């Protein structure tokens, strides 16, 4: 059994920023692989909508899978649209059309308006 004094402390759940070094048997240190996730952003949105509500790690995992799934669907559809129109670049127009095709009714309208707002904010900040 490894000596607990030599091993690095476990990083906090949900926090994927810090790359801690792990002690190997031969004394050399190696970096732990980073796990990318949307947990920080999901948490920020949760606090904007419901400041007094928390989220379990299991629920965060589900939300992370959901965001990854939606991202892949939109990217795939946008890629197809660009290919159909003989374009090599995915622009905000392809993303917007992909969102309209993938999301139902009112949800698509809200997503498009929020996306347009985000792009406008980004463009004006440049």
From Swiss-Prot:
There is a cross-link at residues 35, 121 (Glycyl lysine isopeptide (Lys-Gly) (interchain with G-Cter in ubiquitin)). GO terms for molecular function: DNA binding; protein heterodimerization activity; structural constituent of chromatin. Its main location: nucleus. InterPro entries: Histone-fold, Histone_H2A/H2B/H3, Histone_H2B, HISTONE_H2B_site. The modification N6,N6-dimethyllysine is found at residue 58. The modification Phosphoserine is found at residues 15, 37. The modification N6-lactoyllysine is found at residues 6, 12, 16-17, 21, 24, 44, 86, 109, 117, 121. The modification Phosphothreonine is found at residue 116. One of its GO terms (cellular component) is nucleus. Core component of nucleosome. Nucleosomes wrap and compact DNA into chromatin, limiting DNA accessibility to the cellular machineries which require DNA as a template. Histones thereby play a central role in transcription regulation, DNA repair, DNA replication and chromosomal stability. DNA accessibility is regulated via a complex set of post-translational modifications of histones, also called histone code, and nucleosome remodeling. This is Histone H2B type 2-F. It comes from Homo sapiens (Human).
